[in-house]
Amino acid sequence: MAKIISFDEESRRALERGVNALADAVKITLGPKGRNVLLEKKYGTPQIVNDGITVAKEIELEDPLENTGARLIQEVASKTKDVAGDGTTTATVLVQALIREGLKNVAAGTNPVSLKRGIDKTTEALVAEIAKVAKPVEGSAIAQVATVSSGNDEEVGAMIAQAVEKVTKDGVITVEESKSLTTELEVVEGMQIDRGYISPYFITNNERQTVELENVRILITDKKISSIQELVPVLEKVARLGQPLLIIAEDVEGDALATLVVNKARGVLSVAAIKAPGFGERRKALLQDIAILTDGQLISEEIGLSLDTASLEALGTAQKITIEKDNTTIVAGNTTKPEIQKRIAQIRRQLEETDSEYDSEKLQERIAKLAGGIAVIKVGAATETELKDRKLRIEDALNATKAAVAEGIVPGGGKTLIYLASKVDEIKKNFDEEEKIGADIVKRALEAPLRQIADNAGAEGSVIVSRVKDSDFNIGYNAATGEFEDLIAAGIIDPAKVVRSALQNAASIAGLVLTTEAIVVEKPEKKSAAPADAGMGGMGGMGGMGGMGGMGGMGGMGMF
């Protein structure tokens, strides 16, 4: 495949054109008065969105050099969303401003490496400043963060705050589409396993088609159980106690399953069985989690334990277990135990070390299950277009809320970035001359988000920026009302993590663009044009078909 190679100023300008094309489409969504973007879909109705990352992901430019610039902005937006969950549009506006100001200086002869160094050093100092001014999130502030990020939807803000309160900081909150018109919150207490009863004969509540057991003993093993002989010793011990028994195994089949069903039907023993969740190594980890949660032991031949010698002490206990066709919920009621906290800390260390998004999600799920909380926000709307837009807003709000709980909050509406700009002169005092230019580029770029918020609200951006610069730390511009007020008191707040991530990611990509000296991209293949009137020319001869009046003329075919 042939390549196109572009050098020096030409390469940087191509990147800038790509950056501007994408950033100009994304930045109009910023702020409470952000405009909508209409996305054409190959199939179905167009989608109306007010979400920066969604717009960014949809854009692909025809020119391969410019498309490289657009891809860099997509990287900024994606990375910010992955780390902080929100702030993608702010990061896009920042990186566009940094690149625009930076390229002006590179074209004027400033050393791009020194510029990058100045940008990096300034950003590092400003990140430390964000940590200093951030306030921990308490009570109603959680609802305020969620309300702002969901496009000022107070109902959503209250719902997310309620979910966070119920599942605690270790819990998992997910967003799903609902079949109804309303948006509802559903909280699952205890550990939920995505496995249901092996046999419907275990059902105890015929109306709900569920198995409901209380004060339960739990046998946890990674074995496949086929013979009842292996289970007899445990069954006899549990029968003497008069408690129900849940068996969690790789599978229960044949003679073993038949005997359990018969004993359940005759009322000899209240028993149920489910398959172990997960696969491979993850299955063992999940079974170990269940064992720790229920104060039991994983019976595995790998560690020298067998079913026929299992003692009562090896069985876990639970206050209540509900088994449905596809799910099982275990309420252990002792999630504050030191062993559980140790297990959570161990999984959290694994979470810090993993680079895989899938593994990260599964580890976070395990933490939530051990901590005893999973909440589901079921999003409803009248139309599919509205549903998708509402779901995106709620996901943004949820991510912003998690970020706020993690690192605290700062005044929103671009005010914190304006405050950081006022610190740059102090930061750059000991920089080299060209590094100071890099610091000034950051200073000017920090004004861009507030200017854009004001422009989107129909105000004069430069005037708003000038007024906010001269006000106290908490006082800023409320674009929703057009007033200057105490932003924290008004509930216009940003998670510190979002501001930090947006600034760091924007500075990182801007530095890459400024120090780019060459771009190598694949040369687009020219679409091969069909030969002029290929085949159609022959069709002209079809006119002669009229002369075929007598098929006898076909005798001439003998020439072949």
Swiss-Prot record:
Recorded GO CC terms: cytoplasm
Substrates-to-products reaction catalysed: ATP + H2O + a folded polypeptide = ADP + phosphate + an unfolded polypeptide
InterPro entries: Cpn60/GroEL, Cpn60/GroEL/TCP-1, GroEL-like_apical_dom_sf, GROEL-like_equatorial_sf, TCP-1-like_intermed_sf
Record-level GO BP terms: protein refolding
Any GO MF annotation of the entry: unfolded protein binding
Keyword Transport: no
Enzyme class: isomerase
Intracellular or extracellular location(s): Cytoplasm
Keywords in alphabetical order: ATP-binding, Chaperone, Cytoplasm, Isomerase, Nucleotide-binding
Gene3D superfamilies: GroEL (3.50.7.10), GroEL-like equatorial domain (1.10.560.10), TCP-1-like chaperonin intermediate domain (3.30.260.10)
Enzyme Commission number(s) from the entry: 5.6.1.7
Amino-acid positions noted as binding ATP in the UniProt annotation, renumbered to this chain: 29-32, 86-90, 413, 478-480, 494
Sequence similarity: Belongs to the chaperonin (HSP60) family.
Chain's role: Together with its co-chaperonin GroES, plays an essential role in assisting protein folding. The GroEL-GroES system forms a nano-cage that allows encapsulation of the non-native substrate proteins and provides a physical environment optimized to promote and accelerate protein folding.
SUBUNIT field: Forms a cylinder of 14 subunits composed of two heptameric rings stacked back-to-back. Interacts with the co-chaperonin GroES.
Protein name per its UniProtKB record: Chaperonin GroEL 2
Organism: Nostoc sp. (strain PCC 7120 / SAG 25.82 / UTEX 2576)
Underlying gene: groEL2
